[in-house]
């Protein structure tokens, strides 16, 4: 790779910019076609880059898909962790669910990536499972900071809530659970409050 600046940008900056274009194209295509509809050729066409630049940043299509998934996961988890874990437990839960549902409504592409099953892709299935555990950890941290810890700890109830909320949000996104975002956040809060006994 050249070490010269080009149009005022270093080689590293140009690589990073191309990677961002590829990630944006992958996000768009995945949200439109599902993960199995994403191809190296399609990503290159959408980003306006050649496959040479694709392979500069990613080993293969799966590496791109994992990077897109990680970006969505990190953004959603970051928003959840920004919710103040203080106050009445139900208020904390409601704030977390409102934050999550608002984020999904703000960028529906994230909803498809975060809440559709990646069946047929072992790498994506593993990553999605790991994300479920990470979000459950955030929920457990938030709830345990404002509510008594139930017998047996908070991990099991947190996993149960996150899985159930994921199913409810998936049904909502598919139009099978009619509700406003506010009603959905309230339903999620009610269900999880019962699980945690608060």
Pin down the residues of each PLM region.
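C-terminal peripheral helix-coil segments that are non-catalytic and often amphipathic
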Residues: 1-5, 102, 141, 171-198
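N-terminal intrinsically disordered/low-complexity leader segments
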Residues: 1-17, 147
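Generic hydrophobic, amphipathic alpha-helix propensity
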Residues: 15-26, 43, 68-76
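Helix-turn-helix
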Residues: 21, 29-63, 67
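Hydrophobic alpha-helical connector segments
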Residues: 67, 81-109, 185
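Secondary-structure edge/capping motif, primarily at the C-terminal ends of alpha-helices
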Residues: 80-84, 114-118, 146, 172-176
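Amphipathic alpha-helical segments used for helix-helix packing
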Residues: 104-123, 140-143, 170
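Amphipathic alpha-helical packing segments from all-alpha helical-bundle domains
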Residues: 122-147, 152-167, 190
């Amino acid at each position: 790779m050249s070490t010269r600046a080009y149009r005022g940008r270093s080689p590293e900056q140009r690589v990073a910019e191309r990677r961002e274009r590829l990630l944006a194209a992958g996000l768009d295509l995945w949200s439109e076609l599902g993960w199995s509809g994403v191809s190296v050729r399609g990503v290159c066409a959408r980003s306006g880059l050649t496959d040479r630049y694709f392979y500069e940043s990613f080993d293969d299509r799966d590496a791109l898909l994992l990077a897109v998934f990680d970006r969505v996961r990190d953004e959603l988890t970051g928003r959840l962790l920004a919710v103040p874990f203080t106050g009445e437990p139900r208020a904390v839960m409601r704030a977390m669910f409102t934050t999550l549902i608002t984020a999904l409504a703000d960028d529906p592409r994230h909803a498809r990536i975060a809440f559709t099953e990646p069946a047929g892709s072992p790498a994506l299935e593993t990553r999605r499972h790991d994300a479920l555990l990470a979000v459950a950890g955030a929920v457990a941290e938030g709830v345990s900071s404002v509510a008594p810890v139930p017998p047996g700890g908070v991990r099991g109830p947190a996993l149960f809530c996150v899985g159930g909320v994921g199913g409810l949000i998936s049904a909502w996104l598919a139009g099978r659970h009619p509700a406003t975002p506010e009603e959905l956040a309230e339903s999620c809060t009610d269900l999880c409050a019962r699980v945690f006994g608060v």
